Amino acid sequence: MFSSQINLGSVRDIDDSVFVRQASIGNPDLKPSTSSNQNFGLIFQKDSYKFSIDYWEVDYDDRIEVESAQALLTQDPFGPSITRNEFGDLIGVTTTYFNEENTKISGTDFQFDYIFELNNYSPISLRVKGTIFDEFLTPQITADGLSKMINRVGKFNYDSHTHSLPKKRLNAFMDWEHNGYLLSLITRYVDGYTNERPITGLGASLGYKNKVDSFLVFDISARKSIDLDEGNINFGIAIINALDESAPRLYDAPDFSFDTRVHDPRGRLVNLNLEYNF
């Protein structure tokens, strides 16, 4: 972790929101991270059904993490990583990598598979996969100077050295293959989460709130394979986010935008594909 880079980024200062220089530098004093893991699982299968569930825990010591410019500024607006001019205006924040003393993560993964048998046609396959985050505990220094473990699940986490952590994610896949055609439907769901960043009067007047809504999108696709004397041709069309759902709004002043780590803002996308194999 010795590389360094500089870019512009938005942060919320004491009484203003600004774009400033954010430098990220290496840390030669990093220690290797270690962890202990536990998993408990169950698999049930009968005929066309299959269900699996897995509970997991990971306990990290010295997990390597990169500092958040906003978290540094929130914790100490005049700290050693903060650069200001002679008038006190914020002009830069310097971040680096560090060893987080302790991190505890736990959650549950599950998967369900089912084959629908159709009398005179090919079967339809269904698969549902999901993850539920229970805990993502990281230390935080309280107002009295003590370290306290905070659960980051279900939060935007603008003020900590981590990122958004929706509690639930769910994906469902349905496929039907018949006479050389493959038809697919994919459903993607991301749970909503809270945003504890204070919202200004302007932001509230524009409809922003302290919750990022859940996000549900559907993707559909069709594919046709044609065999030739030498090789085959595959035609495909896919409509991503078929209902043209907009990314949930996120108040992250000075940005009035979306969560770049979680949501795709591009709306409906149409992809065409032609492939020749020989």
Task: Indicate residue ranges for each PLM-predicted region.
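C-terminal beta-signal and adjacent terminal beta-strands/loops
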Residues: 60-61, 134, 187-201, 224-278
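Outer-membrane beta-barrel proteins
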Residues: 46-48, 59, 113-119, 124-126, ...
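Extracellular loop and loop/strand-boundary signature of outer-membrane beta-barrel proteins
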Residues: 25-28, 94-99, 154-161, 204-210, ...
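Gram-negative outer-membrane beta-barrel transporters
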Residues: 56-197
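Generic long, charged, amphipathic alpha-helical segments
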Residues: 187, 196-217, 221
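Membrane-embedded beta-strand positions of outer-membrane beta-barrel proteins
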Residues: 40-42, 51-53, 112, 126-130, ...
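Outer-membrane beta-barrel signature, preferentially recognizing the C-terminal barrel domain
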Residues: 1-52, 58-59, 85-108, 113-118, ...
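Flexible, surface-exposed loop regions and adjacent strand-edge segments
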Residues: 1-8, 67-77, 142-151, 199-205, ...
